[in-house]
Amino acid sequence: MKMIKSYIPRVAAVNDLSGFGKVSLTEAIPIMSAMGVEVCPLPTSVLSTHTYKFTDYTFLDMTEEMRRIIAHWQSLGLHFDAVYSGYMGSAEQIGIISEYISFLKKNGECTPLTVIDPVLGDNVLSDAETVYYDRMSGLIGAMRKYVALADVITPNLTEACLLLDEDYPHESISEDRLTSMLKRLSALGPERVAVTSVMADKNKMVVGVYDKTLDRVSLIDCGYIDRPFHGTGDIFASVLTGALVKGKDMISASNIAVDFIKCAIAETLKHPEIPIEHGVLFENILSDFFAKNK
């Protein structure tokens, strides 16, 4: 099969598309583009807004269209340097992308990096049970099998607990327990793991990173601000993916992602009138940040 050549790194971004609210694909596309990465979106659903704090939003399931998009891409011989997936609305969608990843690994010029953000629940520390229960039937089990295909996974702490089938730590988590979780998540399949939104103590949040090849655990200090910033998990996964396909190692890529989020939050805090659900002001910092972090 003739392959369509990529002149810069090319990523298939599998996620939902919300018209308003800066989340998922509306973050992945501009962020990775600013990093010098070609982004090919494969929407799992299309919404008028994201679902946090908005009501009466529209929702279009894209399951059947996903099959048609993939079939067309296959006919074109599209090659991807990475597949990055986020929100999956059903076990069926997970199955569709699992098959496509297997196809790319078998038929591509090289094996694409597979980055999976296993979206299963909101990491809301005041109410750790805020999970998408209306869509959970069979999804957690399917996600556990799905992450076995990944090179990299980026769950938040809630999602890490769901994947490992253990209780969420309502207080801060010890370094020993976090290290154990990172290694057990890697045992599910991925060589590299980043767990986000981890409270190391009451005034400190970290990202826990594990690289199985190096058998190395790193804790990246994120600081702590006592309010949520919607969409930062998607930003982390997007920057991480972009940095990895540009040749950065896992620890360096994770540090770049955390630094970008810190800068975006600092920019957002200059405008306290902006509602939380409108997302963070990452647009103002894109050019300067990635010019300095190539």
Regions of interest found by a model, annotated:
Residues K2-I116, L120-T130, F282-S287, K292:
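Conserved N-terminal subdomain of the carbohydrate kinase-like
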Residues G19, V217-G231:
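Short pre-catalytic strand/loop immediately N-terminal to key active-site residues, enriched for Gly-Thr
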Residues V37, P190, K248:
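Short phosphate-binding/catalytic loops that engage adenosine nucleotides
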Residues L162, R227-M250:
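Short, small-residue alpha-helix embedded
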Residues R216-S218, A243-A257:
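Phosphate-handling active-site elements
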